[in-house]
Amino acid sequence: MCGICGFVGKVEDKSAILEKMMNRIIHRGPDDAGTYEKKEAALGFRRLSIIDLENGHQPMFNENGDVVIVFNGEIYNHREVRRDLEEKGHIFKNASDTECLIHAYEEYKEGMLSRLRGMFGFAVWDEKENTLFMARDFFGIKPLYYSCLLYTSPSPRD
């Protein structure tokens, strides 16, 4: 099983925090590891190879480099989704189900979830929109945990 981690926000020592997170999930992926750090997002990935062993390195990017994904799981119908996306003009570089998710996000945004069959958890950082989209499969076979802590004293001002 793979492992993903990350955070969004203006954080000092982003690299150190991401490294600690990656070390906590090292047992989830002996085959590969990758990180993404830019502006307000940091994503990490530990890989256990299942599909497309040669081309599944993550984080994975779209052609422009402004959409990035970390993904844990398997999309059972990725070939069907891929055919649909190719008909809409998307060009694929490899056969991984991860790349299929990037193109599905570009085409359908959150609506992509209704097209997916499988067990998965993923996080997509969209640099143009400055947004993080995270999802897991409908049955929770691949859990996805998130948390947020915000505090202030005294009250913030603009």
What does each model-found stretch correspond to?
Residues 154-158:
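A short, hydrophobic C-terminal helix/tail in secreted or cell-surface proteins
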Residues 1-153:
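N-terminus-centric sequence/structural signature that marks the extreme N-terminus
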